[in-house]
């Protein structure tokens, strides 16, 4: 059975900011980008451990999927069968801020 995917406030803000930035030059590309990110993270709902453990945190429950140059960071909550999308982080920004 799939896990429910829940976007945190930070992750929603990250995605919104990225889509708005891209749409300044290319609205169609921005829409495609946003939908591709959502589709990619939905994979974590089907296969929660598909992503690698976030190396900076080294916690089994904290994973990431690459969407170059971004890191789609999520938490696995097995007890409630929920995957929380935590951040959409540009890899050039260094270590992700989890708060």
Range-by-range predicted roles:
Residues 1-62, 78, 96:
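Basic, Lys/Arg-enriched alpha-helical interface segments
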């Amino acid at each position: 059975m799939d896990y429910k995917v829940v976007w945190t406030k930070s992750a929603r803000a990250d995605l919104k900011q990225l889509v708005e930035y891209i749409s300044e030059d290319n609205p169609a590309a921005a829409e495609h980008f946003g939908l591709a990110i959502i589709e990619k993270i939905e994979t974590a709902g089907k296969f929660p451990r598909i992503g690698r453990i976030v190396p900076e945190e080294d916690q089994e429950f904290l994973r990431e999927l690459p969407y170059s140059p971004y890191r789609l960071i999520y938490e696995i909550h097995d007890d409630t069968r929920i995957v929380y999308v935590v951040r959409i982080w540009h890899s050039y920004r260094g270590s992700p801020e989890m708060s």
